[in-house]
Regions:
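Negatively charged, low-complexity tracts enriched in Asp/Glu with abundant Ser/Thr
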Residues: 2-52
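Intrinsically disordered, low-complexity regions enriched in Ser/Pro/Gly/Gln/His and often acidic
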Residues: 15, 72-73, 83-87
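Amphipathic, interaction-prone secondary-structure segments
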Residues: 38-73
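A short, exposed loop/beta-hairpin motif centered on an aromatic-Gly-Thr core
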Residues: 40-41, 78-110
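Surface-exposed beta-strand edges and their flanking turn/coil or helix-capping segments
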Residues: 69-70, 79-82, 120
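Low-complexity intrinsically disordered segments
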Residues: 114-125
Length: 125
């Protein structure tokens, strides 16, 4: 094979698996990516349909905080690209509406009281 043949040869078509249903994605994503946090994960509270979660974290200083996350499903183009990687998931957890900063608490009781007063908690949990 000459250099130009090798350079301009067509790449074989890659079989792209079909995007799973939303219910399958939600089930797949449960308990995933909890190791991505720098702080210790103390508890995880899932919404009624399990598409959202509150992750309660404990920092090195002993203080607690939480983060609300929602499942982001990749679109078709993203899925085509991601499928080329091993162990690819069709979605990822991301901070809900991009909100990352939360208050810091000395104990989990105060944290849970604050968490339960949030409108997202009242609506989805």
């Amino acid at each position: 094979m000459s250099f130009f043949d090798w350079l301009f040869r067509k790449k074989p078509k890659q079989n792209i698996p079909q995007m799973p249903s939303w219910e399958s994605i939600v089930e797949m994503m449960r308990y995933k990516h909890l190791d991505a946090f720098a702080d210790e994960v103390v508890n995880v509270i899932y919404s009624q349909d399990c598409s959202m979660r509150y992750v309660i974290l404990k920092g090195e200083n002993g203080l607690f905080t939480y983060q609300l996350e929602a499942i982001y499903q990749y679109d078709e183009d993203e899925w085509k690209y991601i499928c080329s990687h091993d162990n690819a998931l069709p979605a990822m957890w991301e901070p809900f509406r991009g909100i990352v900063g939360k208050s810091v608490f000395e104990n989990t009781n105060d944290l849970l009281k604050e968490l339960k007063s949030e409108p997202e908690y009242k609506q989805y949990f």
